């Protein structure tokens, strides 16, 4: 038995599934896939590598198929569909196709670390009390390397802002590099395949009582920078990120209604009480109190409305939570997905 197929606890690493989506990655797909395969061969006795082509319009898929043919390894599976539907759709498609008890989702180019798959696997396999693990560059021992400063600021600011609104217990809410137990993630019903996907998964798993942990990691874009595949920041990018953050916060408000609508209700009612005291003071001192009392009444009415929203949305969430665990295959929505493995490609 190879020592590198053992975890730090000395246990033999079991079968693992790695899911990596890609879209128009013609410049790096072969290098990225090769690096991941080498890492899996070093760290695991048995594995499967699922690459999901999210409707690429360049020759990424053809290059990848040629690479797999040369490597001659049947452990690699390629899923493909058209048209492009977003990375999150690709992730759920790959997750639903995975067969190992532990499923790891990450970029194929190992930008989260050469040993990220082993570390995520061990953080889950060696700790039975954990249900999923998130890799975070925002922890004390994590960081960024060759990542544009603007993206670092957006990641740190966005995740910190979400953390203020969402009592998740983690520092990284939006990253895709995670490890899940198959019994936890495959049945999860997903309704959003935009940027809210990662947040929806986190929110639903936490609501259902599943336990999460984090490991520190350094996110490096050295390979992407060397290949010139990093897109420069633009005003459009900034606006898109602001829309993403806004939609994340709206999603959290709906997902945790008592926390937000309830808080607004309390604040509004306290303000109404303040207007009542102001009106009484005006009345005692000979001033006009009617305007203050009228405003207090309106605020009290709004407070009751917000409280009603929180109760209704909480009940709706509790009712819908019962159906969150029957969602395997929901990502595909019966869309045609083509699958390739070595024996099919080499014909």
Where do the model's predicted regions map?
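N-proximal low-complexity "stem/linker" segments adjacent to membrane-targeting elements
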Residues: 1-38
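Hydrophobic helical membrane-anchoring modules
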Residues: 1-14, 196, 200-347
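Donor nucleotide-sugar binding loop of glycosyltransferases
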Residues: 25-28, 56, 87, 113
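Acidic helix N-cap motif at the loop->helix transition within catalytic regions
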Residues: 27-31, 58-67
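Short helix-capping segments at alpha-helix termini
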Residues: 40-45, 69-75, 126-128
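Short beta-strand/loop segment that forms part of the nucleotide-sugar
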Residues: 45-55, 77-80
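A conserved acidic beta->alpha catalytic loop
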Residues: 53-62, 110
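Acceptor/aglycone-binding surface of glycosyltransferases and processive sugar-polymer synthases
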Residues: 75, 81-97, 102-105, 114-195, ...
């Amino acid at each position: 038995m190879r020592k590198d197929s053992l975890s730090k606890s000395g246990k033999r690493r079991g079968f693992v599934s790695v899911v990596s989506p890609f879209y128009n990655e013609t410049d790096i797909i072969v290098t990225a896939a090769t690096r991941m395969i080498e890492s899996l061969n070093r760290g695991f006795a048995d594995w499967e590598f699922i690459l999901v082509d999210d409707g690429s319009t360049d020759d990424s898929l053809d290059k990848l198929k040629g690479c797999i043919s040369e490597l001659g390894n049947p452990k690699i599976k390629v899923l493909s569909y058209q048209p492009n539907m977003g990375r999150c759709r690709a992730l759920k498609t790959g997750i639903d196709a995975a067969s190992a008890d532990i499923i790891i989702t990450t970029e194929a180019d190992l930008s989260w670390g050469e040993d990220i798959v082993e570390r995520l696997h061990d953080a889950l396999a060696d700790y039975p009390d954990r249900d999923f693990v998130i890799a975070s560059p925002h922890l004390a021992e994590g960081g960024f390397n060759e990542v544009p400063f603007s993206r670092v600021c957006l990641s740190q600011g966005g995740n910190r802002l979400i953390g203020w609104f969402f009592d998740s217990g983690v520092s990284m809410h939006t990253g895709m590099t995670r490890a899940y137990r198959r019994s936890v993630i495959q049945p999860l019903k997903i309704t959003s395949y935009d940027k809210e996907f990662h947040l929806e998964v986190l929110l639903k798993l936490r609501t259902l009582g599943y336990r999460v942990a984090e490991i520190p990691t350094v996110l490096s874009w050295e390979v992407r920078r060397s290949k010139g595949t990093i897109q420069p920041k633009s005003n459009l990018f900034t606006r898109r990120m602001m829309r993403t953050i806004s939609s994340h916060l709206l999603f959290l408000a709906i997902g945790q209604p008592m926390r937000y609508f309830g808080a607004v209700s309390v604040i509004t009612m306290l303000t109404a009480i303040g207007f009542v005291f102001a009106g009484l003071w005006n009345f005692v001192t000979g001033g006009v109190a009617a305007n203050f009392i009228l405003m207090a009444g309106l605020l009290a009415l709004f407070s009751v409305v917000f409280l009603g929203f929180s109760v209704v949305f909480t009940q709706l969430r509790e009712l819908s939570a019962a159906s969150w665990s029957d969602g395997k295959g929901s990502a595909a929505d019966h869309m045609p997905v083509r699958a390739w493995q070595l024996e099919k490609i080499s014909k």
